[in-house]
Regions:
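Multi-bladed beta-propeller domains
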Residues: 1-9, 35-57, 88-121, 141-173, ...
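Hydrophobic beta-strand positions that form the internal "hydrophobic ladder"
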Residues: 22, 68, 125-127, 182-183, ...
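A flexible loop/linker signature enriched in serine peptidases of the S9 family
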Residues: 4-9, 25-34, 50-55, 71-86, ...
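Serine-hydrolase catalytic core recognition
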Residues: 119, 217-222, 226-314
Length: 314
């Protein structure tokens, strides 16, 4: 065990093989911190790299250039409303030398801005989802060796979809870098699709049968994710991004006849304050029951989303 038993929680870590250390998030009675542990020792006290007055999440390490990125927000804000992207330069021991903060003031915006899922490319560019356009789209940030931003490409891929999830838990990922390109999942009208976002600004939709994605990670030209469809239960999805061949391993087998599974029909209706609300209607479909029951599910929270993947609990 790397750490001594104590009154704190560790999560969201990354491994720096160059320095042979684990860098991760720690929560204790004083707040949130970024800490490190040597991979060559056991039962250590944490090495404190950074301490926050607020909350931390989504570490992204570029060990080749000694750079670390993360998301930070105050305790009075929800992370999907307002947060900051922090970019730090590390020394040879893994301690922070300097940081740069990206927020609505940096981008000269009066509106609140939210960042999600910072990811480093092989070339050392930082990609992050942010909603300055009103949609969570991907922004590219190029920095110099001192960690100073030199080029920020906002709205490189202009598309009115959400390429992010509300930050309720650690470990979520909606896109990943593949060479000069980005592969990611995006939501439109409650349906998730998979696409390649090419460096030249074009977007290529990947043809496949799934409409729910989460936990996207890539290695070279292969992508893995958790996916499901309206008739296929949730499982591990793997795709070769060169020839687009894919495999799906369900977590459990579906014992229902596909003819007995109702397919959701997307529709919009007018809710309170004349706001438009999206929903899914599942028409009754069951040959064994003459009068199928009516089930209505709703969520009044700020980030609830009606999904169309197969859910056998419903």
């Amino acid at each position: 065990c790397l750490s001594k038993k104590n009154n704190y929680f560790l999560a969201g870590g990354v491994i720096d093989l160059e320095k042979n250390i684990w860098i991760g998030l720690m929560e204790d009675y004083d707040g949130d911190h970024i800490v490190s542990y040597s991979l060559e020792k056991t039962y250590q006290q944490p090495n404190f790299i950074y301490s926050s007055q607020g909350l931390l999440g989504y570490l992204a390490l570029n060990s080749n250039d000694n750079k670390l990125a993360w998301i930070e927000w105050t305790k009075t804000s929800m992370p999907w409303d307002l947060n900051e992207l922090k970019l730090a330069k590390l020394n040879e021991k893994g301690n922070i030398i300097r940081t740069v903060s990206f927020n609505n003031e940096y981008f000269k915006l009066k509106e609140k801005i939210s960042f999600f899922n910072p990811v480093w490319s092989e070339k050392g560019d930082l990609y992050v989802a942010e909603d300055s356009s009103g949609w969570w789209n991907i922004t590219q940030i190029k920095t110099d060796t001192d960690n100073k931003p030199i080029v920020i490409s906002q709205n490189k891929w202009t598309i009115q979809v959400e390429i992010a999830f509300p930050q309720w838990v650690l470990g979520m990922s909606s896109f990943s870098c593949v060479g000069d390109d980005v592969v990611g999942a995006f939501a439109k009208d409650g349906v998730w699709s998979l696409a390649l976002f090419h460096n030249n600004g074009s977007i290529q939709i990947i043809d496949q049968p799934f409409n729910e994605f989460s936990g996207l990670y890539s290695n070279q030209n292969r992508l893995v994710a958790i996916s499901s469809s309206s008739v296929i239960s949730e499982g591990i999805f793997e795709i070769d991004l060169l020839d687009k061949s894919w495999e799906h391993t369900p977590a459990s087998s579906v014992i229902l006849d596909p003819k007995e599974i109702s397919i959701g029909e997307s529709f919009w209706f007018t809710g309170s304050n004349e706001d438009k609300v999206h929903a899914w209607y599942y028409p009754p479909l069951n040959s064994q029951i003459s009068l199928p029951p009516l089930l209505v599910k709703s969520h009044s929270g700020p980030t609830g989303m009606a999904r169309c993947g197969l859910d056998l609990e419903v």
